[in-house]
Amino acid sequence: MVDRHEEIKKSYKQLGGIADVYDGIITRSTLIGKIMDSVIWGLDEKLAAKWVNDALAPIPENFSGKLLEVPVGTGVITMPVFKTLDKAEITCLDYSADMMKNAQKRAEAMDIRNVSFVQGDVGKLPFEDESFDIVLSLNGFHAFPDKEAAYSETYRVLKKGGIFCGCFYIAREFDRTDWFVKHMYVPKGFFTPPFETKNSLKERLEKMYEKADVHSVNAEGVFCCIK
């Protein structure tokens, strides 16, 4: 299995001029990133690599279909992966123009030509029903204000038999993270309650999809569903 976490770290170091504090935390490639990852999320290098690799594992290495990523953020996690999927048709959507601009810069710097960018709302996706073979969502649902619409829309645009995969914060798995979410992330507007627990997420996805796997890496809920 390809260690996609290592690919992401290498890309971050090569394109450091585009990166920001968020990228450093995700990749653990900066001192502040390692400190925050350890203190807030309780992650060491091994656990950080695990949630990234687990969340991306459902994407076949030779994937050649249509993939939607929502939200794309800065693209620090996914652009190194998309670079290897040159036969795929990839669409990246984000509500934040600033975040998406960073992702576009990263794609251009890496000469990724099969990715298009769309500014939009996950609660009202501008795509036809059953448009994508894979819908990928990394660290988005804990921030989405209308989570019910987000679940409904990501399901709607996914083809029958398609894959819905990714990860996001779930409550009651790691007390220290829960404390920081309540006292820092929510007040600052980074995260928006209510939050899923591992059990509630598993129950929800099992009702929606033909098959659903949910597990946790500390406070990261990682999921893979088949429609």
Question: Where are the predicted features?
Answer:
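N-terminal, positively charged/glycine-rich alpha-helical extensions of SAM-dependent methyltransferases
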Residues: 1-35
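C-terminal alpha-helical "lid/dimerization" subdomain adjacent to the S-adenosyl-L-methionine
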Residues: 16, 25, 39, 45, ...
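Conserved alpha-helix/loop element of class I SAM-dependent methyltransferases that forms part
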Residues: 42-64
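Short glycine-centered segments of the SAM/dcSAM-binding site in methyltransferase folds
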Residues: 66, 161-163
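Class I SAM-dependent methyltransferase SAM/SAH-binding core
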Residues: 66-124
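A short acidic, Gly/Pro-enriched loop at the edge of an enzyme's catalytic core
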Residues: 123-134
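A short SAM/SAH-binding and catalytic strip from SAM-dependent methyltransferases
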Residues: 134-146
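A short glycine-rich, Lys/Arg-flanked "PGG" loop and its adjoining helix->strand segment in the class I
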Residues: 148-160
